[in-house]
Amino acid sequence: MPEYRSKTSTHGRNMAGARALWRATGVMETDFGKPIIAVANSFTQFVPGHVHLHNMGQLVAREIEKAGAIAKEFNTIAIDDGIAMGHSGMLYSLPSRDLIADSIEYMVNAHCADALVCISNCDKITPGMLIAAMRLNIPTIFVSGGPMEAGKVIGVANIQPERRLDLIDAMIESADDNVSNRQVEEVEQNACPTCGSCSGMFTANSMNCLTEALGLSLPGNGSYLATHAGRKELFLEAGRMIVEITKRYYEQNDETVLPRSIATKKAFENAMTMDIAMGGSTNTILHLLAVANEAGVDFKMADIDRLSRVVPCICKTAPNNHDYYMEDVHRAGGIFAILKELDKAGKLHTDVHTIHAPTLKDAIEQWDVTNPENTRAIERFKAAPGGVRTTQAFSQNRMWKTLDLDREKGCIRDVAHAYSQDGGLAVLFGNIAERGCVVKTAGVDESILKFTGRARVFESQEDAVEGILGNQIVAGDIVIIRYEGPKGGPGMQEMLYPTSYLKSKGLGKACALLTDGRFSGGTSGLSIGHASPEAAEGGAIGLVHEGDTVEIDIPNRSIHLAISDEELAARRAEMEARGSKAWKPKNRDRYVSAALRAYGAMATSADKGAVRDVAQIER
């Protein structure tokens, strides 16, 4: 039977000093002996997805105390990728994932906490907390802040029809010379109307949905709107449940509640299957690989490639389809509706554990909104947007009269009526990316699934943006942006601005983009990222010359630099001859801080999740 970790600092004569300090935090004499639950919040006023989390930690903490445990809240950092986008701030986004994981490990282990509640929401916070959960392997529950409501705009002088929109619309239209200043202003003012993570299936919402598929959060975690009063119950339930599973582990020796017992290889395959089926962000591949690595699970790019070939796309939302947003996914039954359709098609391992049900099979049955007996599920998924600008959580209680149960033409479809039988994400291999690169196929027009073009090579995102806005790119070009990987950036910037600007120039379906960097979850189009190995690690993307021909074949999962093996070898030898200047960008003027240099020194390429190679410390 495992002992409560907290006994280390709360029991014994030699811990009198520690107990004195615990008392100073409000712990009473009768509390000693109760489990100590760490509540890792990520509130910040910098990020709309986190601006409403200020009171969430204490909401959970009070429920933990009612259930018979001690709750202690602390905070982690949270970077807004949208605000950091397009300038040097984006270099810090991915490295922050490791800082978040480390900070949680430090706090939990330093204070000997017994269990953990992770209050996350946006892009790097959820994966950072997942990495920490796998590293610590103590009872853990995730509860996120929830998605933002979709924006709405009537149109200038009421001439245009009403349309829904999001952050990406603001970025694209601001760079389109055909859009007036007044129209841009209207889009800007309406794109992000409420608190919460951006309203489409971008990285934040994708990751929060994946915590449901992994079995580490409650149903609705990824889709229940941040503004809806009903979401409060998720926080309260998380507070009660963490105490229950903590006691099951420490007092009943039930290891099935531990993160590593829940997030097995089967669970990672389920999460990736669901991600492919809903056309999630390509960043999810990066993060799932990193989380699996921390969990000691043998889950690699080859597994993702295998799944991508057999899983259809049955849910298609913004940015891939502007008919649907997260609020529509919720109305259709949320993530468990997607899981149900995948299960019916035999695409899931349903014998895995979850924190809230003995098996995933049980959970799917309990949260099936098509079963009229599941009244709790039906009521939860009727939650609707309020349509009022706000930064306050739980500020409205509007409900849909009916759910979207149309599995033929609705938001979530059955496999027979899938948006496409080919999944929403794919891994490509070839001489330009020997260890793979990734593309969100859900966002690629069918006309360019096979594409051959002329390479236009840029050694930084900044140069690429200048080239695109300077009209240097024409139809048929393939924009190559290299030395932007985890090591080469360092920090693996997102390339949302280059892809958005290609669209604003009318080239969204006429060009491709390949990079060893990554993309925002808001990216769509023929945008291929995570080229591995990256240029700074000796990857062949660093050997592409201006004007080379690159051949992309998504159906056959290939990407090829059209030169001979002999020519490629000769270019590699020429690069190596540069000595200390080899595999480094030419003429790039970029300030790199000591913190970023430290990250880059240990960073691995994207095919390994861009995790730190800690083995270097031992060498």
From Swiss-Prot:
Q: What is its EC number?
A: 4.2.1.9
Gene Ontology terms for molecular function: 2 iron, 2 sulfur cluster binding; dihydroxy-acid dehydratase activity; hydro-lyase activity; magnesium ion binding
Name the keywords, alphabetized.
2Fe-2S, Amino-acid biosynthesis, Branched-chain amino acid biosynthesis, Iron, Iron-sulfur, Lyase, Magnesium, Metal-binding
Q: Which residues make up the binding site for [2Fe-2S] cluster?
A: C122, C198
The keyword Lyase is annotated on this UniProt entry: yes
Write down which residues bear the modification named N6-carboxylysine: K124
Q: Taxonomically, which superkingdom?
A: Bacteria
Q: Name one Pfam family in it.
A: ILV_EDD_C
Reaction catalysed? (2R)-2,3-dihydroxy-3-methylbutanoate = 3-methyl-2-oxobutanoate + H2O; (2R,3R)-2,3-dihydroxy-3-methylpentanoate = (S)-3-methyl-2-oxopentanoate + H2O
Please give the pathway this protein is involved in.
Amino-acid biosynthesis; L-isoleucine biosynthesis; L-isoleucine from 2-oxobutanoate: step 3/4; Amino-acid biosynthesis; L-valine biosynthesis; L-valine from pyruvate: step 3/4
Q: Where does Mg(2+) bind?
A: D81, D123, K124, E494
Gene Ontology cellular component list:
cytosol
Q: Which Gene3D superfamilies match?
A: IlvD/EDD C-terminal domain-like
How is the cofactor bound here? Answer: Binds 1 [2Fe-2S] cluster per subunit. This cluster acts as a Lewis acid cofactor.
Entry annotation: catalytic residues? S520 (proton acceptor)
In Gene Ontology terms, what is a biological process of this protein?
Answer: isoleucine biosynthetic process
Q: Which cofactor does the UniProt annotation name?
A: [2Fe-2S] cluster; Mg(2+)
Subunit details for this protein? Homodimer.
The job of this chain, per UniProt, is described as: Functions in the biosynthesis of branched-chain amino acids. Catalyzes the dehydration of (2R,3R)-2,3-dihydroxy-3-methylpentanoate (2,3-dihydroxy-3-methylvalerate) into 2-oxo-3-methylpentanoate (2-oxo-3-methylvalerate) and of (2R)-2,3-dihydroxy-3-methylbutanoate (2,3-dihydroxyisovalerate) into 2-oxo-3-methylbutanoate (2-oxoisovalerate), the penultimate precursor to L-isoleucine and L-valine, respectively.
The UniProt similarity line reads: Belongs to the IlvD/Edd family.
Recorded hits in HAMAP family, A to Z, give:
IlvD
Question: This protein is called what?
Answer: Dihydroxy-acid dehydratase
Q: Which organism is it from?
A: Neisseria meningitidis serogroup B (strain ATCC BAA-335 / MC58)
What gene name does this entry carry? ilvD1
